[in-house]
UniProtKB/Swiss-Prot annotation:
Protein family membership: Belongs to the RRP12 family.
Modification type Phosphoserine: residues: 82, 85, 96, 1094-1095, 1117, 1119, 1221, 1225, 1227, 1230, 1250-1251
Coiled coil, from the record: none
Extent of Polar residues compositional bias: 19-29, 1176-1191, 1276-1285, 1297-1315
Any single GO CC term annotated in Swiss-Prot or TrEMBL for this entry: nucleus
Keyword Phosphoprotein found: yes
Presence of the UniProt keyword Nucleus in the record: yes
Name of the protein in its database record: RRP12-like protein
Amino acid sequence: MGKFRSKLKRNGKGKTWSRGESATSNPTQMKHRMKAKSRFFQPNLSLAAATTTGLTMEAVHKHEQSQAFNAETTTVNDVAGSLRSFKLDDDDDGMSGSGTAPTGTAPTGTIKTFQTFASNYSGCSNTCFQKLVTSFRSSSALHKEMLAILSALTEIIRENGGGESSTEYFLLLMEQIEAATEERDIVAGVTLLAMGINSVPAPVLKKRFAQTADTMQRLLQRFMESTNQSVIRHVIGCLSVILRAQDYAAWSYSSTFQYFDAILAFSIHSQPKIRKAAQHAIALIIHGSCFMLPAIKSDDNEMDEAVEQPKVKHHPASSRVAKFCLAQFKPEVLANAQTTVLHTLELLKDTLYGFKTEDIRSVCEHLLSIMTAANVLVRTNCFQTLYSLFLKKSPNLNASLCAKLLAAIHEYRPDKSDIRQTIAWVTVLKEGHLHLATMQLDLCMQALPRLIDVCTTDLWLSDQKELVAGVSNCIKELLQDCVSRACATAEDAQCNRQSVSRIIASLHKMLNAPFGEISRFVILIFSFVFEACGKLFGSELTPPLMTICKRYDTQSAHRLQIEHTVISAIKALGPELVLTAIPLADGKGVMQLERSWLLPLLREGANGASLQFFKEKIVALAMDCQLKWKEFAEAKNNSSSHIYELLCCQLWGLFPGFCRQPRDPEYLRYLAPTLGAAVEKNPEFRPPIYDGLMELLGDNQSAECHQAIGQYAKNFLPRLFNIYTQKPNGTYEADQRKRVLEVIRLYISRAPADVQLELFENAQEQLAASALASFEYDAFFDINAAIVRVQTCKGIKAYFDKYMAPILRNDKSKLVAKDEQKLKKQQRKTYELLRELMTSELPSCQKFTRKNSIVLQQILLDSFNTSCNVCQASRLHCLKSLIDCHSNLAYNDQLVMKAIPEAVLNYKEFSNYKEQVAEQLIKSITQLYHDAGKINDFVDILTAGFAGDEMLVTNTILAFRAVLQQQGEHLTVATLEFVLQQVSVFLVQKSRKQAEAAIAFLITFIKVMPIPLVANHLEAIMRSLSAMTKDTKRYCRIQIGYLLKKLCIRFSPGELAGFVPGDDDVIHRRLKMIRKRTRRDLRKKQNLEAQEDSSDDELVSGLQEKSYTIDDMLADSDSDLPEDMDAKDEAGAAAAASKRSKNAKQQKSTYIREDPDEIVDLADLKSIGNVLTSGSAQTATPAQSQKTKAQLPNGGFKTADDGRLIISDKALRGQGGNDQSDDDSDSDASMAYGTVAKQPKVKRGMEDDSSDEDKLQQKLVPKRVRKGDDAMSMKSGKTTASSRYTAGGKGIHRQLTAGNSDAMSVKSGKSTSRPAGSEYGSKKAKGDMKKSGKLDPYAYIPLTRNNLNKRKRSMNSRKFKSVLRGAGAENGGAGGGRVSKKYK
């Protein structure tokens, strides 16, 4: 066993500086600095407290309440209730935190007066202004002005006896805004009005409509040119709320449209916040006006008439929005102000589906017309607008218009090399077909084959995985939502057969066409095809199924996809059709081994099959395999025999699949004899037959199936009885024997009553004839136990009196074994059967328990001393059943009093199952005492267990834990303190079990009890933990750690450490670790929240955005708050805006694909496919070619015919050597990126070594002294793309000159190669000489492990000296003086 070693005395290294942070002067953790800063304003530092005191008013209140009770009579619930009634208001005027709205006004919630700086100046209790009170910042001038106005209004309302309702604040704020002259007063009033106007009742807004709307319009005119964006946003928000509250008749006035036009004008504002606020307001008015929403049922107390208004399909102002948007699509706007067009499209995304049908048609026509423009951004936004129109599934877009619109969108198909636009195009069409299917299914099915054909024959053949996956998802949704609905019934399938057949044919073509990466998607798509239309289109789906199965191979990469699709086909088409298309046997009836992979799939996917097909085809084939199996076994051909054995077993294994809801259960009369013979004669076929019988007898089968299988009970049950009474040989047969008993129990319940009675009588005779406690006796006892459950109450009573009661009473009878071990076995089985009878939900068993409860109670109580330990769990179940079946059982009944000690004694023995039963029994008894008001008496009874042995004490503590968990709030404080003291005594004992139980009790005590009560006993708990022995503390270390964590949640680690003795290093160290872990977790949580806030603010790109409902939009409108209150949100929005702008700059590139033989006509509709974005496959090629330029043959270097590198003299001198081919490639790349200007020529050492990125890097990086670790430094050992190659050395790096191109000179025959470093030699002096533009003349000596060897050190030092001597370093100033000079 390991030991605790204290780490307090170790000299740790301490916290070190992070790399590169040694000059940081502001650390992240500033605990001591914050402590010093908090004492800055104290007048006399010598009198200031060293630490902040924990004495607060709340702590004083809690302390007084925890001490102000009578421990003998007050319960824990009383203390908790008194704590919940605390109010920390110190106001003398009697103002409370809750108020009610006066009659006639809308009910408004109230808030607690939070103790903040703003609470000292404003006692507003209206929930609308909660954020101002709680998030007040004294540094904000706007907050100060708002708080002053709110305080004044609150005071006026209270002086006049108001209830601080939203109506009162609304009226007063409007008066304040109209009377204010200074801008800051108006801004503060408007901000407060925006916070509370959403809760103002609609009748008030209707009554004050003219005056309020006129004031808002004048404010818009006044602040139109102002730099304060927030006031404009708040005014727009207030005006939208007012307009939404007006009824349908109010929109017949011109003044209402005048106010609406004022908001509409700001929807294309240049400022994004103002523009988004206006667009949001327009959308709310169009969709969220009072007459557009469902009518709210009026209450009985209200006087309003509950007259349901006719549902309005479109808003009266929608036509005005449509005219406004169409005015922005004029040619001059498209040519000069495309940004305005984009803003208009953004407005249409949220409002178009609320227009009337004529306006939707006009807008869509203009959208299609501007989509021919070359601006890809405009076209993408048009796709998004159409997508939102289809996504909302508005009834204003009728079926005919939707079908025409889908046909027109087909003409605007982009080129498939442009991945993003193609996916957007397909997604828009998919959503349009889904909407058309909801409106008129036959029109959708007429238009759907065209889209499927385009997706399969063209888009699926793309080499871009992203496009293939997107198209596959669209096809899947169309199959699930459109085709499946068209094939729901036989009539619908007949009407749409031609369209569905075309879709299947288009998909089947892709199975026959050569393809590679798409094969996985095509195979999986067919699984959805089988699910959608497999039941009624079997003939059309048979050829695709045959094609898919031909591709199956165990080594295939798509094996799993093929198996999944075949299983879907089996479920939809049925095993008969699948096996007809793909037969398991050839024409001669011989099993084809290559088709054996279908057998496991058939068992898993078969459902609703025919038993006749199984009998005529599968069983016949299995019999044939069985004959060949035996023939090969007799011929001693083991391999073939084993193959046919497996095939035969797999064919019989199909039986459970054919039993899942069979179509012809009446055919069981022909199949039952075959099954009975197989069960009796072939043990290897029994498992699948058992599974099939369980399927036929299950609850999910029909009544006809149960009746059919019940008629053959005499055929199966006797055979099953014989199998169960046979002694198993091995674990496999033992497991199968248990399975047989499960089949018997389920089959007995489905058999007819006369068959049950007959089998019960025969089983009793067999039981009586068997020897006691023998294998046969136990087997027949289990069979009788399975049958007796379904007998009548009279039959159960007779069996109980004859075979069960003598064993329970341990009578001296011939039916009771005399041997102790055999008696234990008998008692265990008898108690289990009695528990099953008493807990069963069958009517006969419940009747038996009620009628014989007194007899059962007497037998159970008398047999307490004679029962063995292994049957205690069943005894406890029986006692609990007896207690539950008594409706008016008294708490002091004899059954209850005798069940308490038995439950405590067996609380935690032998198994967890018994512990759960004992806990349930104790909780039931606890509930009885609680109902009688004697819960403390029950605790006194349990206290007697503390005087027992170790196990009894442990169980008593755990029983108290169960009582505390269920009825702890009803215990008196004195009783609770007594129990806690007793548990603390056993906590410090040497017994491990007692200590573990005591800690479990303390954990429950901390969870259940109120904090003040736990605080009163906190010192005793901590001192008891410290006083534990080392052995028990080590044994319960995990439980102690959990206890300390729970304590640290309710109290601080510092408070707990104050109660721990100083010599207990273990507890102190654990508390310290918990404190560190808590702080670390808090920092992580804060960082995660900050990251989530920043990520939530980012804009979701693409068409698959969240579809907001009008309720979500209305909820968003409630967050109209001052800007400086949402600083964090604005920071996140700014970050997201910067990210979006950065992405927008990257996405502005647009390219036109040209044909050198044709002229591009941008006005032609077909030219829309030639406009590509930067994300297309063709435009990505130049960028990829630049990145992969180093991957050219030979790395881009020129080579001779013999493989040598050709390096010109110009390259060695670093001069320009550009050839025409390189210029052409660079110019092509620049043209691909849309650049026309010529780049200035830069001298390069090699033709293809540098790139445009290197030139840009040379221009941007200033000249500086390189450090040793710089990537451009030669010392660093790093290489970059801009490094220059210099010839020199050996091999292919040798100098390429005329004289020494070969190793030997042809003329002289001597070697012309010079020793390395000779070019640094001086002609007139000794030593080496540094040359400009070359490396320093260093001698690089390799460092090996031999240099570290002591025996070889002297030899290596001599080598080093020779090197120095050769370099002239040891000759002093004579030889090395010139070399040792410092060169700049």
